[in-house]
Design a protein with these regions (language model features):
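N-terminal beta1-alpha1-beta2 submodule of the flavodoxin-like/Rossmannoid cofactor-binding fold
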Residues: 1-104, 176-208
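FMN-binding flavodoxin-like domain, especially the glycine-rich phosphate-binding loop
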Residues: 73, 90-208
Length: 208
């Protein structure tokens, strides 16, 4: 089992990074790798080169190929991110746009239709929300976010749905309450990953 933690927050002292560190510690001594997209200066822009690679199903830019290699090592992927305007930050969205592409995460053609390729990967979500749980339920924000990511991305690529653990009221809680909220979310994700450790593994079929 190997877990890839992907974080998208430009502030190194953010709650996102605190959660990232707690999650890494909770998963040890298991195999864990961190992709801090802001620190690594990942370029989220979908360029003409990305568009050509998307339509051709190959010849990916070097930085995209490097992300493919990281994902191919992983059995579990955890996306840790602050919720911006009821969705993921542009940096993380750009990572998805550029990395989860035709020919690698899935194959599609009008003749053969869709063939998902990430069956060997389980994807977990840890969104950090500023508002409370009631607001997310009342306005359908949680359902919309989960539909967009879990169904629109995870299911489409054939990845298995893992656990989703929201941290609510991230800018309003007292420090002690914040720690408790982080404890719950980290425990939910880490226990889900450990519970899979003895389950039969499916070979990862991302494109080399």
């Amino acid at each position: 089992m190997h877990t890839l933690l992907v974080a998208a927050n430009p502030a190194p002292r953010s709650l996102t990074h605190y959660v990232l560190g707690r999650l890494e510690a909770a998963l040890k001594p298991g195999s864990v790798e961190i992709a801090d997209l802001a620190e690594e200066r990942f370029d989220p822009r979908f360029t003409p080169a990305d568009r050509r690679a998307y339509h051709d199903g190959g010849n990916y830019p070097a930085d995209v190929t490097a992300e493919h290699r990281r994902l191919e090592r992983a059995t579990d992927l955890v996306l840790v991110f602050p919720v911006y305007w009821w969705s993921m930050p542009a940096l993380l969205k750009g990572w998805i746009d550029r990395v989860f592409v035709n020919g690698w995460a899935f194959e599609y053609s009008p003749a053969s239709g869709l063939r998902p390729k990430l069956q060997g990967l389980t994807t977990h979500l840890l969104p950090i929300a500023g508002d409370d749980c009631g607001a997310y339920e009342r306005h359908g924000y949680e359902s919309a976010l989960r539909t967009q990511i879990e169904h629109g991305i995870v299911d489409y690529c054939g990845s298995q749905r893992g656990s989703t653990a929201f941290i609510y009221r991230s800018e309003q809680l007292a420090p002690e309450a914040t720690v408790r909220a982080v404890d719950r979310a980290v425990r939910t994700i880490s226990e889900a990953i450990r519970a899979r450790a003895n389950a039969p593994l499916t070979k990862f079929h991302g494109r080399a």
